[in-house]
Structure formats: C-alpha cells, structure tokens
Amino acid sequence: MSLLPPEQRQLLHRCILNYIRSQVPGDGAEGETGGQTEERHVMNSLAKWLRVDPDGLDGEKAADGSLLPRKWSSIVRLQRRIIELEKEIQELTDENENLRENGPSSPANGALKSWLPRERPSFSISAGASVTSVKLHPELPLVFIATDAGKLQCYDLMNYTMPVASVQAHMRGITAIDAYVGEDSQCLVATASKDLHCKVFRFVDSELQLIRTLSGHEHIVSHIKIWNNSTNTLVASCSRDLTCKVWDIANGWCLKSFQPHTEWVRCLDVMGDFVVTGSNDCTVRLSHWPTGRSLSFGTGHEFPVEKIRIIPLQPPESAEHSHRFNTHDEDYLPLGFSHVISTSRDGTLRIWQVPLPRFVAHRAPQPNPARPYFNLVATLKGHSSWVRDVRVRGKHAFSCSDDRSIKVWDLSTCEVVRSINNLHSGFINCIDIDCGGLNRQLLVSGGADGKLVILMK
C-alpha cells in the first residue's frame, strides 16, 4: 500500500510518465515507423498501469519533463539540510553534557580555553569592501575592521546594525591592524597600508581619533604590531621595501630600521626585544630589534610566508593549558617563547622551535654558532590553498585559507579537530580570537566577499 495520499500519488505517476516521454523521440511528421509504434504501445501500457490518462498530458505544465529531476534535487537538498541539523543537535548535546559534568564555563575550570566554535555563524556584518584585517577589542565586546578601501570601522557585537565608529584611515587599502589597551585603559589602534604609511588612532567616546602618522617606508607596509615595552608604547612595521621599523608613538620617531630578509617582509610578531618575521624569500627569522641583529632563521616553506605568530610560554600554574609548544621552560624565559607558527602560500602551517641565542651579561644577545637554524617540529597539512592567517588559543590553533575554510588544530596531536566551511563566498583573509585578556568564546573572520562573520557561543 502506498504511503502517499491519492493526489500526491497521481502527481508522482504523471511526473514519471512525462519524464519517460521526454526521453523518447517524438512522433514522426508522416506516419509512424515500427520503432515509434512500439514506443507508443509501451507508453500506453505504462499509463494504463500507473492509471494515468495519456491524453491528459498535453498541457504546458503537464508536459514539463524536468519536473521529476527538480523534485529529486529538492530531496537531496532536504537530506543535506537534515544532516546539518543533526550535526548542530549533536554539538548542542555535547555542550549540554559538558555543562552537566563540569558546570558553567569559567577561567577557573579551563573550559573557556578549550572552546571550539560551532560550524554555523551567529551573525555577519557587511563591511562594504574586502575585509583585510580584523581585531577584537582586548576588553570590550567590540571589533575593529579594516578594508581594502582604506576604511577603519568599529562595531559593537551586541548591537551591530550600525558601526560605533568609522573613519577613512588611508587613501589606499589597509593591510593590517592591531589594538592595545594600556594601563590608563586607553585603546590604541595601529594600521598599516598600501599608501606607505602607518597610523595610530585613539578610540575614545565612540570616536577613532588620529594621534600619529608614521612615515618612512618606501613601499607597501605589510603588517603592524603595537605593544608596551617598559614605559613606552611602540609600533613595529614591516614592508615590501625589505625593512622592519620600530616606532615610538609618543613622538613618532623611528627608533630602529633593519633589513632581516632579502625579499618582501610579509609579516611579523613581537615579544619584548625580539621580533620574528616571515618573507617572500620563504624563510622565517628571529631578530633582536634594538640592535637589528639577526639571531637565527628557518627554511622549509616552498612559497612566501603569509603570517607568523609567537606561541608564548605558559606560566607553571597553567599546566592544564600546556602542550609541547608552550610548556614552561626556564631556559627560554629570557626569550619569552620557544616556538612560533607560520602559514604559507604552500597550503601548510609549520611549527618551529626557535634556537636560544647566546645571552651575555651587559651585552645584546648574540647568534649561537652551534644552532643557527630553526628546528621544524611539525607541518600541519589540511588546507588546499594559501593559508592566510593563524591564531593560537590554549591547546588549539585556528587557521583560515583561500579554500574558504577555517580549521581548528589540536596542538597536542597536530590534527584537524574541526573544519568550518561555507562561512564566506570568497577567500577568507583574516581571523581573530581571544588569545589573552578576557577569555570570551568568540571568533571573527573577514573575507574577500566584504563580510565579517562572528562565531560565538
């Protein structure tokens, strides 16, 4: 007995008959051949068996032979949607079980740092142009967005209908931004641009106020980092002119300019007096910026390096969040880190152990002749195109790529534990996640499609 009601069963039979009729040749202009007579006989027999009037199929709607394939395609789409919903239900079930076992998430129980984003976005924001860099406010529920049109915007994640602040920061595209909150609770936002300039803005009273323009690079400024060094707030920048420069925001002076690579310096990260850089020459390098001296370097990438990040050492009391790349090591305390992670256009992420330089009392660090090279300890493969950005949080690394996916890697096993697809319709240029300060369960990504996508619990 059929599970379909009579009307749906009749419609299905008509669709079947129409589909078969659309696949056989039509009637001849003059008479019928033997083959056509046999086909007509088969069609009449099938119509009789299905209890469909073959003469009632001549209407425009009835004669549509594509109706059955369309219905089949809709079933496939429904099945795909069912699979997505089942996956979402499983994620919610896992979260519920975790709450039952461990209680609410808090910094004390470490649940926040082990958070993995869901595969469905919470919401998205249209930036109006390709998003080139994003940065979460270190303390407030705000996100700073930079676009290839040179605009810098700030959105409140609790009310994202309109930007809190927006300014045309540069005449050409912004390549990178960074944010820092000092002891006086002032938020400073640094930008780098294709117009050869770096700028520093103060975010206060829902305004982005320009306080400093840093000029000196002779080509595109690729990346920027802002941090506090002792009592001064400094900015480090790198450029296609092959140089890295360190600036004092208080007066706008360039404190140091040095050339760590032989080709375009694409990216950098800073900790204290040490800077790590990645370049079009496919190498990564450790330098002591106050002297400009190169201390060691690593080779292994096959194409230009897109991003490099320092993996800071964990304090002894945070052993629960430790893995082999950030375990507390007394020998590395003067450096502040033992490993870095880099991404490349070769589709891989690579984790490097940085060799310790020679530390001599009352002298600048010296290269160690016995260990001049980085030690490649892990290669993470999973992306199928350029890997644009990476962030490290707890025991996980988060990467985004031109293959339109965000992947979450377990640093204990170097395996993908979650792959998030279909967030953007174009390349994913940048991501950010809380790596320190407030442990919010929040990830943002920016794409070439002009969208900022937010994933939160």
UniProtKB/Swiss-Prot annotation:
Transit peptide as UniProt keyword: no
Xref: SUPFAM superfamilies: Lissencephaly-1 protein (Lis-1, PAF-AH alpha) N-terminal domain, WD40 repeat-like
Top-level taxon: Eukaryota
Keywords: Cell cycle, Cell division, Coiled coil, Cytoplasm, Cytoskeleton, Microtubule, Mitosis, Repeat, Transport, WD repeat
Record localization: Cytoplasm, Cytoskeleton; Cytoplasm, Cytoskeleton, Spindle pole
Coiled-coil segments: 73-106
Protein name (Swiss-Prot/TrEMBL): Nuclear distribution protein PAC1
Protein species of origin: Lachancea thermotolerans (strain ATCC 56472 / CBS 6340 / NRRL Y-8284)
